[in-house]
From Swiss-Prot:
Keyword field: Endoplasmic reticulum, ER-Golgi transport, Golgi apparatus, Membrane, Protein transport, Signal, Transmembrane, Transmembrane helix, Transport
UniProt name for this protein: Endoplasmic reticulum vesicle protein 25
GO biological process, one term: intracellular protein transport
GO CC field: COPII-coated ER to Golgi transport vesicle; endoplasmic reticulum; endoplasmic reticulum membrane; endoplasmic reticulum-Golgi intermediate compartment; Golgi apparatus; Golgi membrane
General function of this protein: Constituent of COPII-coated endoplasmic reticulum-derived transport vesicles. Required for efficient transport of a subset of secretory proteins to the Golgi. Facilitates retrograde transport from the Golgi to the endoplasmic reticulum.
Amino acid sequence: MASLKSLLSGFLLLAGAAQALKFDLEATSSHHSNQRRCIRNFVNKDTLVVVTATLDGYKGDGMNVNMHISDSHGNEYGKAKDIAGEQRIVFTSHHDAAFDVCFENYLTGSKYVENPRRHVELDIDIGADAKDWSAIQATEKLKPLETDLRRIEELVGEVVNEMDYLRAREQKLRDTNESTNNRVKWFGMATTFLLIALWGWQIMYLRAYFRSKHLI
C-alpha cells in the first residue's frame, strides 16, 4: 500500500509539475493591440479551464491593467478591467482550439509612476488540474487514495482524448494530402492531353497551310 501511495504521489507530482508563468508587464501611454502581452494555450472542447492571474500594485497607482481571454474561433471567455491582486476567470471551452490570455497595461495619467510596470504571475489549469479535488473529496466522501485514483483516471482520460484528437487530425491531414495529390495527378494528365491535342492541331494546320500554298 505504501508503494502504491508513493507511485500515485509521484504521478500526480509529475502531472502537476508545471509552474506559474511570471513576467513583467510594462505600462504604455497609448492603446494599441501590438502592445498586448498574450499567452497561448490549446484546449479540447468542453474542457474546464481556470485562469488565475496575480498582480502586484494596487488600483489607483497610475496604471490600469486589463485581462482578456478569447479563442481562435472568436469566442469570448472573459474580460477583467483595472485588475490588481488576484483575478480568476473560469470557463468551459466551446471548441478544440487555441485560446489567448492577453494583458494590457496603460498609464492613466492621474499620477507620476516611477517604475511603470506590473509583475504578473499567471496560472492556467486545464481539465483535471482545474478541479477542486478537496471539495470533491469532501462532497463525495472519498478517501485520499480514492481521490488520487480519481484524479489519475481523469488525467489519463485527457491524455487518451488528446491522442484521439491528434490521430483524427493526422487522418484529416492525410486525406487532404491524398486529395491534393489526386487533383495534381489529374491536372497533370489533363495538361498533357491538352498539349498533345494542341501539338496535333498545329501539325494538321501547318499541313493544310503548306498544301494550300502547293508546297507539299
